[in-house]
């Protein structure tokens, strides 16, 4: 069970679907998420002359001491593989002369910003991932708010959801519960079990 249908939730649903059945619960329609409104591009060290180490240095310097070095390290080391996943899922990144186009922006020392549809990157990623999720058999339940986990012996075993159209409560069971970006996270008393599929 995946809670949320933004880029993180849809991406996780496609990876998890490679290993079993998946249900995505989202409080609005699948195309009503913040991902759709994300403009600009995605930074990843995928170009010639670039590296995770250089990307790390640029990011730490631009962060002016506010960046968590371990989080930045994970981000830059994983970025190229995640971009390759998005390409595999069909995200139409802009190209130039047959290769992914890379722009030089902000505090980056080399071109490493990928765009899709110019500044409509978020919309293109969300549209592509939601289409792939549906065509790959990911079950999607829209207008379903998840206020509570179902816990058994200290482990999350499912969720209680409210169908926002009917007001009816529904329960869903699952071996793994993945939550990514939901506003009520801090109100949950029991931690969610993170699936190894999300790594």
Residue map of PLM features:
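Core beta-strand elements of the Rossmann-like FAD/NAD(P) dinucleotide-binding domain
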Residues: 165-176
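Short glycine/serine/threonine-rich phosphate/pyrophosphate-binding segments
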Residues: 9-12, 170, 186-187
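N-terminal Rossmann-like FAD-binding beta1-loop-alpha1 element of flavoenzymes
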Residues: 1-24
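Short, glycine/charged-enriched secondary-structure capping and boundary segments
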Residues: 16, 37-40, 187, 191-194
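Glycine-rich loop(s) and the adjacent beta-strand/alpha-helix scaffold that form part
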Residues: 175-199
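Conserved N-terminal/central alpha/beta ligand/cofactor-binding core
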Residues: 21, 26-157, 161-163
């Amino acid at each position: 069970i995946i809670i949320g249908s933004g880029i993180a939730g849809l991406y996780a649903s496609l990876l998890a679907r490679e290993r079993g059945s998946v249900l995505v619960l989202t409080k609005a329609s699948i195309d009503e998420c913040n991902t759709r409104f994300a403009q600009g591009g995605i930074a990843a060290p995928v170009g010639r002359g670039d590296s995770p180490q250089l990307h790390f240095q640029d990011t730490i310097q631009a962060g002016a001491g506010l960046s968590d070095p371990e989080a930045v390290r994970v981000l830059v080391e994983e970025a190229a593989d995640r971009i390759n996943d998005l390409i595999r899922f069909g995200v139409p990144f802009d190209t130039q002369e047959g290769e992914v186009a890379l722009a030089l922006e902000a505090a980056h020392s080399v071109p490493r910003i990928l765009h899709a549809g110019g500044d409509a990157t978020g919309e293109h990623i969300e549209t592509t991932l939601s289409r792939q999720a549906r065509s790959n058999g990911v079950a999607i339940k829209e207008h379903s708010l998840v206020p509570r986990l179902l816990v058994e012996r200290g482990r999350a075993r499912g969720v209680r959801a409210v169908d926002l159209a009917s007001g009816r409560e529904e329960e869903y069971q699952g071996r793994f519960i993945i939550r990514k970006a939901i506003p009520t996270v801090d109100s949950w008393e029991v931690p969610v079990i993170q699936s190894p599929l999300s790594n």
